[in-house]
Amino acid sequence: MSIRAEEISALIKQQIENYESQIQVSDVGTVIQIGDGIARVHGLDNVMSGELVEFANGVMGMALNLEENNVGIVILGPYTGIKEGDEVRRTGRIMEVPVGEALIGRVVNPLGQPVDGLGPVETTETRPIESPAPGVMDRKSVHEPLQTGIKAIDALVPIGRGQRELIIGDRQTGKTAVAIDTILNQKGQDMICIYVAIGQKESTVRTVVETLRKHGALDYTIVVTASASQPAPLLFLAPYAGVSMGEYFMYKGKHVLVVYDDLSKQAAAYRELSLLLRRPPGREAYPGDVFYLHSRLLERAAKLSDAKGAGSLTALPFVETQAGDISAYIPTNVISITDGQIFLQSDLFFSGVRPAINAGLSVSRVGGAAQIKAMKKVSGTLRLDLAAYRELEAFAQFGSDLDKATQAKLARGARTVEVLKQDLHQPIPVEKQVAIIYALTRGFLDDIPVEDVRRFEKEFFLWLDQNGQHLLEHIRTTKDLPNEEDFNKAIEAFKKTFVVSQ
């Protein structure tokens, strides 16, 4: 069968008309140097700062240094399989993490990948880890209390929803314990908690997760962990991943608490990256933008206005000091960014005052507006009593004869210190805190021996559960003190049943 020439030309025309050229254009660069988790890449001329790039073996990186002839990229994973001459592609995306309800109760790494062995996290939404903080008009002043369940904090340095309160102290002074107790106390408060562990030992993170699980707190908590064995970029990104997961809930009108444990290790990881990228070092070898590293993170904590859904994100950043030096670079930076600090002192911790809060150096700049009326009334003189006690304590050591007023101040101070002590993982509801502090500040404990004060408190709480429920209910619902006469009578009635140890 012969094919005519015109048929051939018609077929060729048809083929030409149907031809579609699909050219895929992608920016590709070449690795010119690799080592210490940093790659220098030539040829990625249009890459953006903070953009994700993909190496030939599938490992992702993040462009941090944009220089004249090359790009400095930090590698977010194992870098042993990457070699000189390898291809690197732009992705056109910035770093994002999965967000949503499915993360609650899970332990994930800073990339949102589960590390708890419970299978994949079923989320569909993501959020960029870097996003602008709410503006001035989108915010509302802090006015709702965030009860930590720790008497010394709720009475002396109250925290409000949307506040940033720094927890600062040497290692082994109970910083993590304060945060865990605060998370445990949020049970039933419609609060979502996010615990970000930065550079912690994996065994420590495991202990924290088990504590949360034992107390039923994992039902409303997300744990983000970048352990000490992980590459520095993951330690640097962990807090931003945590706050992004929290912002998802905040913009839905919910209340979130984020704990960063701790930012000193994040700053050290960022210093490591900056020095490897050959950025000029500043004070203590930190880069010049280490202040911005923390300020852009902590500014994302906010109490949103009603128009924006009235959600809140409260931040509890930790900073570890060396030998109690709070005038070092990172501590002073974070103190100036936050709305107050809780200073934990090792001397107090080792002398048995736990939580070891130094009332003189601890302050809450906005929390006073969030304190409930009842607590405001009873704790007004507490800080002054403690300050006077610490001052007089130094003089009393010389053993000279003291007048009656001084002895009374010392006695009240010693009882105040005892009342503010608290056992680990036993947060106390605010109405019971008000009751014991009321008894203290109104002088009902002045004739109780100091060694019996803790026992008095325990038995008083049990007595209130049985005989004083109406008083506790009044404080809980009205946020104010009940009739003082009734309160005094109740305390007197309990005191009659209390047996002082011989």
From Swiss-Prot:
Residue segments, region Disordered: 115-139
GO CC, one annotated term: plasma membrane
E.C. code: 7.1.2.2
Name of the top EC class for this enzyme: translocase
Residue sites binding ATP per the record: G169, D170, R171, Q172, T173, G174, K175, T176
Cellular location(s): Cell membrane
Presence of the UniProt keyword Membrane in the record: yes
Keyword Iron-sulfur tagged: no
Membrane topology label: Peripheral membrane protein
A GO MF label: ADP binding
Chief location of this protein within or outside the cell: membrane
Site feature (Required for activity) residues: S362
Keyword terms of this UniProt record: ATP synthesis, ATP-binding, Cell membrane, CF(1), Hydrogen ion transport, Ion transport, Membrane, Nucleotide-binding, Translocase, Transport
Record field: catalytic activity: ATP + H2O + 4 H(+)(in) = ADP + phosphate + 5 H(+)(out)
Pfam family, one: ATP-synt_ab_N
Cited Gene3D superfamilies: 2.40.30.20, ATP synthase alpha/beta chain, C-terminal domain, P-loop containing nucleotide triphosphate hydrolases
Role this protein plays: Produces ATP from ADP in the presence of a proton gradient across the membrane. The alpha chain is a regulatory subunit.
UniProt similarity note: Belongs to the ATPase alpha/beta chains family.
HAMAP family: ATP_synth_alpha_bact
Subunit architecture: F-type ATPases have 2 components, CF(1) - the catalytic core - and CF(0) - the membrane proton channel. CF(1) has five subunits: alpha(3), beta(3), gamma(1), delta(1), epsilon(1). CF(0) has three main subunits: a(1), b(2) and c(9-12). The alpha and beta chains form an alternating ring which encloses part of the gamma chain. CF(1) is attached to CF(0) by a central stalk formed by the gamma and epsilon chains, while a peripheral stalk is formed by the delta and b chains.
Name of this protein: ATP synthase subunit alpha
Gene: atpA
